[in-house]
């Protein structure tokens, strides 16, 4: 009999821009050991993930928070289709919503706060502490009992 080995699936989520660039720095090395499925707020991000599966999610922020409701249905549909073992995100608001919905479906979740946040955690990062399974900062000075430091995207 043959044994089919299935890789654990990671859903990697970020808004377009700096959050997306940081996510790719973190997740590209994981593609050797895991099935990484990407999700971002702009379809052009698909061109940056090679042959990995890609989903586009609705974008929103605190300035147009009403979009959070339709975005929730969009994200939940993707979560139920993909059924990842874990979700990793670098933000921003759509990544936080994905973590909240992921926890509701029993998925392990990882928030990595942006390297741009040197003095304090981002607003979404502070909220992520209440929902995410694991929360990371990229600055040792921001580490706490709840927020871990494990290096940064520059390899420091």
Regions found by a protein language model. Give the residues of each.
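Residues at the starts of beta-strands that form the adenosine-phosphate
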Residues: 9, 34-38, 53, 108, ...
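An aromatic- and histidine-rich active-site surface loop
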Residues: 86-105
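N-terminal subdomain of nucleotide-sugar transferases
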Residues: 2-45
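Conserved nucleotide-sugar phosphate-binding/catalytic loop shared by glycosyltransferases and other
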Residues: 14, 34-71, 141, 148-153
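Structural motif
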Residues: 9, 85-86
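Short hydrophobic segments within beta-strands
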Residues: 12-13, 39, 89, 112, ...
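Active-site-proximal region of nucleotide-activated glycan assembly enzymes
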Residues: 107-156
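An amphipathic, basic-hydrophobic alpha-helix
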Residues: 63-85
């Amino acid at each position: 009999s043959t044994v089919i080995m299935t890789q654990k699936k990671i859903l990697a989520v970020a808004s377009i821009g700096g959050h997306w660039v940081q996510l790719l720095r973190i997740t590209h090395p994981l593609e050797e050991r895991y099935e990484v499925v990407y999700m971002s707020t702009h379809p052009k991000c698909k061109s940056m993930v090679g042959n990995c599966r890609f989903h586009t999610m609705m974008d929103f922020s605190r300035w147009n928070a009403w979009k959070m409701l339709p975005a929730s249905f969009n994200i939940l549909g993707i979560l139920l289709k993909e059924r990842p073992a874990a979700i990793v995100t670098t933000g921003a608001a759509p990544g936080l919503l994905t973590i909240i919905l992921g926890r509701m479906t029993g998925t392990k979740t990882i928030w990595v706060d942006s390297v741009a946040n040197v003095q304090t955690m981002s607003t979404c990062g502070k909220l992520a502490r209440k929902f995410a399974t694991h929360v990371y900062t990229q600055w040792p000075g921001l580490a706490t009992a709840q927020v871990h430091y494990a290096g940064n995207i520059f390899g420091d």
